[in-house]
A protein has these predicted regions:
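Rossmann-like dinucleotide-binding domain that binds NAD(P)(H)
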Residues: 1-38, 43-49, 55, 131
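Short, hydrophobic alpha-helical segments
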Residues: 3, 113-124, 141-148
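Short hydrophobic/aromatic-rich beta-strand segments that constitute the beta-sheet cores
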Residues: 11, 41, 65, 72-74, ...
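Short, well-ordered secondary-structure micro-motifs
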Residues: 21-22, 52, 67, 166
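C-terminal glycine/acidic-rich active-site capping loop/insertion
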Residues: 28, 33, 59-131, 153-196
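Short catalytic/ligand-binding loop motif for oxyanion handling, primarily in non-cytosolic enzymes
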Residues: 50, 136
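Generic detector of contiguous secondary-structure segments
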Residues: 52-53, 57-59, 140-142
Length: 196
C-alpha cells in the first residue's frame, strides 16, 4: 500500500515453521499492479537478528531504507529511454546517490499511538489515518486467502470467500498452553526494532 494497492497477489504463509504458534511466522507475497509493476514482500520471525529492508525500484532509480538510512540512487533519465537509445545491450548508467540518515530515535508503534493521542487532544492531522489501515489489512487478508487456497487472489478480496476459509481454520483451532509464564513485551520490542 506504500506504492498503491496491487491488483492481485499470490502468497505462502508458513504456520509454526519456527515457533509453536498457530499463526504464520514466515510469509512470502508476490504482487502484481495495474501498471505492470511487481512487488515482493518477505518476512520471518525465524531469522535472527534478521534484516529490515525496504527497497523500491523504478525506471528512474531506486530507494533503499536499511539500518536507519534512506539511500536514493537516481538516474538522470528513464532507464527505458537509455536502453532504447543505446547500441549496448546493458548500457552503463551514471547515478546520483543521496543518503539521508534517521536523526531521531525510532518510535515505532509507540510513536503512532502518541500521534493518535496528540490528534485527539490537539486536533492535529494523523500521521497514519485509520482509512489507510484498510489497505494493509486488505493485503494481509488476501495473502492469507491465497496461502490457504494456493491460488492467486484478486484485490479487493471476496469477503464471503475469505470469511468461509477463516471459519474453517477457526473450527480446527486448538487451545494451546502459554509457552512462558512471563511478560515478553520487552523481548518482543527489542527484537523488532526496524530503524526506518
Amino acid at each position: 500500500w506504500m506504492v498503491g494497492m496491487p491488483k492481485r497477489l499470490i502468497a505462502n504463509c508458513r504456520i509454526a515453521h519456527f515457533h509453536d504458534i498457530e499463526v504464520e511466522d514466515e510469509a512470502e507475497i508476490y504482487a502484481e499492479y495495474d501498471n505492470g509493476a511487481t512487488g515482493v514482500f518477505l518476512t520471518s520471525t525465524g531469522e535472527y537478528p534478521g534484516t529490515n529492508r525496504l527497497e523500491i525500484s523504478g525506471t528512474k532509480g531506486k530507494a533503499v531504507i536499511e539500518d536507519g538510512t534512506l539511500t536514493l540512487q537516481l538516474l538522470e533519465q528513464d532507464i527505458r529511454e537509455i536502453t532504447a537509445s543505446s547500441s549496448e545491450c546493458m548500457p552503463h548508467c551514471e547515478t546520483k546517490t543521496v543518503k539521508i540518515s534517521q536523526k531521531e530515535p525510532e518510535s515505532g508503534h509507540l510513536g503512532i499511538l502518541n500521534d493518535f493521542s496528540r490528534a485527539i487532544r490537539k486536533g492535529t492531522k494523523l500521521l497514519a489515518p485509520g482509512e489507510e489501515g484498510i489497505f494493509g489489512l486488505s493485503i494481509a487478508n488476501a495473502a492469507y486467502l491465497s496461502s490457504w487456497t494456493h491460488e492467486w487472489v484478486e484485490l479487493p478480496t471476496d469477503g464471503e470467500v475469505y470469511r468461509a476459509e477463516l471459519r474453517r481454520r477457526q473450527q480446527s483451532s486448538a487451545e494451546r498452553k502459554p509457552v512462558r509464564g512471563q511478560n515478553i513485551t520487552g523481548e518482543y520490542s527489542e527484537r523488532w526494532r526496524v530503524k526506518w
